[in-house]
């Protein structure tokens, strides 16, 4: 194979190296006229044509080989064109008539690693081929990488709660419905007597505490500034104060209503009436203070920014006065504890 290649004559360039570098017309003699005039006759030489150079030992990818082949041919064409005169155009025509076979082997591209340009920008490309065009289209969806950590908001995340329904549920838990077993009020089992027993102090404290616990998250929501939602919150607080007043004071005792005593026992120790009354006052006062703090939260979140006299200001003032009246009666022991 090496002997065959060496026996093949080497084709030289049509212009000498000096004329090619200067991009001037060459007489194509040995030496050329230009080199003789410049006193460079000994330096005048013709290099081998690049079109017949040695091929690469290893075959590169189809894209590199095709681009390098075309680049070489266009370079040689430019070098040769710089030395052509008007009478030499026939040689260019004969060279241009030659067919250049470029073989593109797509199998060689399998070893090329795919670099996703969208990945570097923080996007995830969808490599699923399109059914209509057969092209790969990038899907401009934000990735979960450290470059872009912003996630698309879920449509149900903004309105995943219903403050009005929750407020109605809390208000309904304070309702005195004698037809249900879970009511705060208990009716007498004797129908003809038609008497209703007032809920005990422990029942009132338990129900009111659960209602206030469920009300606090609703007060901190932005929906609490809506007037109709704020009125529901005000109704819940008014109902809580109402049950405190009914359970603590004795002025709401009427015909057909009876009080139920509550027995307090600390382990094996039985407390007398005075100890039970003292313990009840302490627990009730503590729960009333908690209700007062919830009322302050309602006043701060439901208030408007205009600084005017809103309806909730009057409602909060009335509820505070009523709550303070219950607290003062407990402290003075004027109310009748159950």
UniProtKB/Swiss-Prot annotation:
One of its GO terms (molecular function) is DNA-binding transcription factor activity, RNA polymerase II-specific. GO terms for cellular component: nucleus. Induction: Expression is induced in presence of sodium nitrate, and repressed by glutamine. Its main location: nucleus. It is found in: Nucleus. One of its GO terms (biological process) is aflatoxin biosynthetic process. Disruption phenotype: Impairs the red pigmentation due to the production of fusarubin. Results in complete down-regulation of the other five FSR genes. Transmembrane segments: none annotated. SUPFAM superfamilies: Zn2/Cys6 DNA-binding domain. PANTHER family: MONODICTYPHENONE CLUSTER TRANSCRIPTION FACTOR-RELATED, OLEATE-ACTIVATED TRANSCRIPTION FACTOR 1-RELATED. Transcription factor that regulates the expression of the gene cluster that mediates the biosynthesis of fusarubins, highly pigmented naphthoquinones responsible for the coloration of the fruiting bodies. This is Fusarubin cluster-specific transcription factor fsr6. The gene is fsr6.
């Amino acid at each position: 194979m090496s002997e065959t290649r060496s026996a093949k004559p080497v084709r030289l360039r049509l212009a000498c190296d000096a004329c090619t570098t200067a991009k001037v017309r060459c007489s194509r003699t040995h030496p050329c006229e230009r080199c003789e005039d410049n006193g460079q006759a000994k330096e005048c030489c013709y290099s081998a044509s690049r079109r017949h150079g040695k091929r690469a030992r290893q075959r590169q990818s189809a894209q590199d080989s095709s681009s390098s082949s075309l680049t070489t041919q266009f370079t040689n064409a430019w070098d040769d064109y710089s030395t052509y005169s008007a009478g030499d155009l026939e040689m260019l025509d004969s060279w241009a008539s030659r067919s250049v076979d470029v073989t593109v082997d797509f199998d060689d591209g399998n070893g090329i690693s795919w670099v996703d340009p969208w990945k570097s920008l923080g996007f995830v490309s969808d490599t699923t081929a399109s059914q209509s065009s057969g092209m790969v289209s990038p899907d401009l969806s934000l990735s979960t990488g450290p470059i872009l950590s912003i996630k698309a908001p879920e449509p149900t995340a903004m309105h995943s709660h219903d403050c009005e329904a929750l407020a109605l549920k809390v208000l309904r838990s304070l309702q005195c419905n004698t037809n249900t077993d879970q009511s705060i009020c208990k009716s007498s089992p004797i129908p003809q007597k038609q008497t209703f027993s007032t809920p005990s102090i422990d029942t009132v404290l338990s129900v009111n505490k659960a209602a206030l616990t469920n009300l606090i998250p609703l007060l901190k929501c932005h929906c609490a500034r809506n007037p109709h939602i704020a009125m529901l919150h005000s109704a819940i607080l008014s109902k809580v104060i109402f049950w405190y007043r009914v359970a603590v004071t004795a002025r709401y005792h009427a015909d057909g209503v009876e009080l139920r005593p509550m027995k307090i026992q600390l382990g094996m120790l039985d407390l007398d009436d005075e100890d039970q009354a003292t313990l009840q006052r302490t627990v009730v006062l503590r729960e009333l203070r908690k209700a007062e703090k919830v009322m302050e939260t309602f006043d701060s979140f439901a208030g408007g920014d205009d600084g005017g006299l809103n309806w909730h200001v009057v409602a909060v003032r009335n509820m505070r006065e009523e709550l303070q009246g219950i607290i003062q009666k407990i402290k003075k022991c004027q109310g009748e504890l159950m």
